[in-house]
């Protein structure tokens, strides 16, 4: 899951979030193979409910959501909302806002999705039970991969960070489309119709100048419930919600600066012995606060608000309930699915991203970005194999409780492929990037 705001500002957050994800995943694996494994499984299967009168918000198909279902289908909607906000911003003003900017990362991402699927299918043929996991190695974890890249500090050219971020965003778009198209059950269109009407309502309310984020989120919860009942995976509701969040601020920067200057010029001076603000001073400060809120668009404001919750709560919880790989028990721990996923992430991502980038540049379709070369592209192509979050998510959708042995194999493949890709990518970049003077 971050994209271009200021790469330097987010380096520290990416590193911390990546470490937290890694530690949480290790903790889950340790607990799942310890005497506390039964407690861990009970936690995952614990049923939840949120009742308002006779209505239970956390119910689906006649049963309460379990803890793992609530996290995967509920809390992960917040993650996908943030992903949607990032995608929308990149499409409007970022690295996907024009063909010139988007061409190379788009082509690289296509290679990074197609080749892993081909490699997976060579190990687990489509049509078999294992073949259901074809889409697992398609994804790149933005936060995790940028976190590893950030460990190299100022040695990394900004263009390389932009390239990694942009092709990971395109990967996310591909992953979202796969989830929406291939991992939806029987569709109940009446629920989707109500959800569509609410989206249209939010769109026109936003066009009329509404900026209350709480209102959009409350309606978003209603839409999430409708998706949960519809058969379309509920996390998709978060992505679509992002596209009706207003992206235009109420004040432009020029007007904001003029207003702040005027407020400061008329700000009452403090008395020599005063330590408490006067009512007039408080009123002026509230004007500053109001103007500052209006110069930030709801899209950017909500995205900023969600980063902390997603990176330090939602994703660690997701890792904890999904990374509990069993190293013993019924069935093969390491099987064809493990190999297919690990090879897809490690070899497939590298070959796909590197070869498609090479073809795009050598054919003259798009130029090589300033500050990048084939050596550091090879390192970033390896980092593209850090699948983790979305790969684990798709693994659960592919196999779920119906195929616990294959799901366990897929999780082991995701974890091993991610770790190897992260280590190799870091080492390659450490060797090829110029040393700091």
UniProtKB/Swiss-Prot annotation:
Q: How does it sit in the membrane?
A: Multi-pass membrane protein
Q: What is this protein called?
A: Na(+)/H(+) antiporter NhaA
Annotated GO biological process: regulation of pH
State whether keyword Transmembrane applies: yes
Q: What does this protein do?
A: Na(+)/H(+) antiporter that extrudes sodium in exchange for external protons.
Q: What is its main location?
A: membrane
Q: Which gene encodes it?
A: nhaA
Protein family per UniProt: Belongs to the NhaA Na(+)/H(+) (TC 2.A.33) antiporter family.
**Alphabetical UniProt keywords:** Antiport, Cell inner membrane, Cell membrane, Ion transport, Membrane, Sodium, Sodium transport, Transmembrane, Transmembrane helix, Transport
Q: Output one GO MF annotation.
A: sodium:proton antiporter activity
Q: Which reaction does it catalyse?
A: Na(+)(in) + 2 H(+)(out) = Na(+)(out) + 2 H(+)(in)
Its cellular-component GO annotations read: plasma membrane
Subcellular location, in the record's words? Answer: Cell inner membrane
Transmembrane stretches, by residue range? 12-32, 65-85, 103-123, 133-153, 162-182, 186-206, 214-234, 308-328, 333-353, 377-397, 412-432
Q: Which domain of life is it from?
A: Bacteria
